[in-house]
Amino acid sequence: MEKFTPSELCADIKIYDYKKKVKYDEKSLVIFEKTGKMITAGKECEGMLYTLPANSIGFSPIVLGRVSDYTCAEKMLKQMLYRYLGKASFTGYGEGLIFIHEKLNEVEMKAYFDLLYQAGAKNVVYADESVKGIPEGTPWEDVIWGMKNTYKNLRFAVEITKEQPMDYFRYSLAELAENCKRWGLEEEMLKLYI
């Protein structure tokens, strides 16, 4: 299978601070020492991925919009929320919104609920592109900012998206080709794409 870099596969994460009315752009990237200690998380990892020390590993805990490594995703999200929202109070950060662009099953949704709770949310609201009552063509960023009108206690939102969806497409095709080869369906796959 074609090799993909962690930055090609990682989700783009946007953190909305309703209190300050600011949006922060991040990447689902982490760098860990092989001992398990996290060195850093987010977009600052991009430049470091190609010059990692021998005792470090860089990867994405959220791939194709799905949590692929729960423990690392939790540590990453905690660090990002701390970076942008400050230290959580005794009762946490308050109510948080998780907005996902990928279609998820119930187990995958539960992983995101748990991630936000573990990262410090007191309560979690889930939303995706199936939100009713949104005028067609409304930018998703406006929808997320507007959620504060519906959920008055929202303190922050986390949007999981992909700015370059072609990377996901290429990866999905390569994975399909690999599976077809494993299943003995290479000819059938070629017929589909020729």
Stretch-by-stretch model annotation:
Residues 1-25, 32-37, 45-194:
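Nucleotide/phosphate-binding catalytic cleft detector across ATP-hydrolyzing
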